[in-house]
Amino acid sequence: MDIPFILGAYASHPTPELEADYYQLLADQPWVSGVEIPYPGQLVTQADVLAAHLAPHWDFNTITAIPGTMQHVWKDATFGLASPDEEGRQAALAFTRALCDDLDDLCDKAGRLLVGRVQLHSAPTRLADAEAFKRSLEEVVGWDWSGATLVVEHCDKYIPEQKPEKGFLSLESEIDIVAEVGIGIHLNWGRSAVEGRDAETAYQHVLEAGVRGVLDGVVFSGAGPEETQYGYAWIDGHLPAQADEPTSLMDAEQIGRCAQAALAGGAEYLGAKVCVPKDASLAKRLAMLEGIYRACHLQG
């Protein structure tokens, strides 16, 4: 099936001196349609380098605002597009405007439109308010996004008795909001699994967004109940698939059923984003990502 497949390559970056070789290796793979770009990251600090890494035939790159969003939330608990605190919401709108402007600059440097989707989030932790988020999205959706479409990436919802990784709005609330605003939902398998503490939650989230007609994309990152080299139990840390990390709940069967459910639910793209052992070769990094792609059963 001809559907874009993106890679969160930044999670599996090698050392800086091997970065260009890694991107070239990814560009040589016919099944790779683009990469997920973390914001701010290289988009702010090394836009020229980033533009050079993006292969000319990659026509479906994405940007995620989650790194910068969380950096702000850790400093200011009221920061977020869903903040009930107006100063916190305005600060998040200013951050989002900067992202929009930096995307425009990146496209100028590359001489073409580069990005298909921009992922926004319903921060802040614990305090997120649905009406505030809706107001923010209604404003930003009208901006010029250099050819990109906005999506809301669901992260684990706030559950009082559970230590949050992100602790944002529920998927149900986000679905209602994006349906009104006219944009879609982006799911990350691991973030949904972290919320429910099981693999089934990820599958149910795919079904829920699909049934409501707002599922836009699904990216596969793992999660699990044990401490690993990638972090503590239930970290939102992009664990590899079970074939490469035995404690990960994301096995080939889970990937396959969620990918097929996503396609049936109208998803426009799929992807993979996993961390890797620090000493992994470039070939091993690629193999870990390609294993997820193969498990989606998109070929033929």
Question: What are these model-derived regions, one by one?
Answer:
Residues 77-182, 284-296:
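Active-site acidic/histidine proton-transfer and metal-coordination neighborhood
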Residues 264-300:
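C-terminal extensions of enzymes
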Residues 2-11, 32-36, 60-62, 115-119, ...:
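Structural preference for beta-strand elements that scaffold enzyme active sites
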Residues 140-232:
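Acidic/histidine-rich catalytic cores of soluble enzymes
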Residues 201-210, 241-266:
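A short, acidic, amphipathic alpha-helical segment used as a generic capping/interface helix at domain edges
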Residues 11-19, 36-50, 126-129, 158-168, ...:
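Acidic-and-aromatic substrate-binding clefts and catalytic sites of carbohydrate-active enzymes
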Residues 20-31, 44-68, 101-113, 140-146, ...:
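Acidic (Asp/Glu)-rich catalytic clusters
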Residues 1-98, 188, 299:
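N-terminal pre-domain/capping segments
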